């Protein structure tokens, strides 16, 4: 199963979701190829933010800093599931295999913690 997580810049939410999903899939014995991408990349912010790494590690889940990547049509077409953090992001990827996080687990859009304090990142990681 190929699962792709998408957020705005691939620096906060989608890398956290990737690490968390990978951890729990492995713990459950589910074979999954998990990755994450952004709709856009800011050249000044092109890797996983430190606050995101800290938030996921607080959950005792391993996560590594990664270089941000932009989602492509090929990535979407080759995935079984593409999971966006917001409806607006889903609307930017008009394919049948694209779902919002809330469509799959409920709870509404996942707000972007970018630019906020560590607590915002911790709350985001916990929700994911």
PLM region descriptions:
Residues 7-10, 83, 128:
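Hydrophobic structural packing positions in well-ordered secondary structure
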Residues 1-77:
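Conserved active-site segments centered on acidic
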Residues 81, 87-127:
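Phosphate-binding/catalytic loops
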């Amino acid at each position: 199963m190929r699962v792709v997580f998408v957020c705005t810049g691939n620096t906060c939410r989608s890398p956290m979701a990737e690490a968390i999903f990978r951890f729990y899939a492995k713990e459950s014995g589910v074979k999954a190829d998990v990755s994450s991408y952004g709709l856009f990349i800011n050249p000044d912010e092109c890797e996983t933010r430190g606050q995101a790494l800290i938030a996921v590690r607080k959950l005792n889940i391993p996560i590594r800093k990664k270089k941000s990547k932009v989602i492509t049509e090929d990535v979407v077409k080759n995935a079984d599931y593409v999971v966006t953090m917001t409806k607006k992001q889903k609307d930017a990827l008009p394919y049948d295999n694209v779902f919002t996080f809330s469509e799959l687990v409920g709870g509404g859009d996942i707000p972007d913690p970018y630019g906020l304090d560590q607590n915002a990142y911790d709350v985001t990681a916990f929700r994911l």
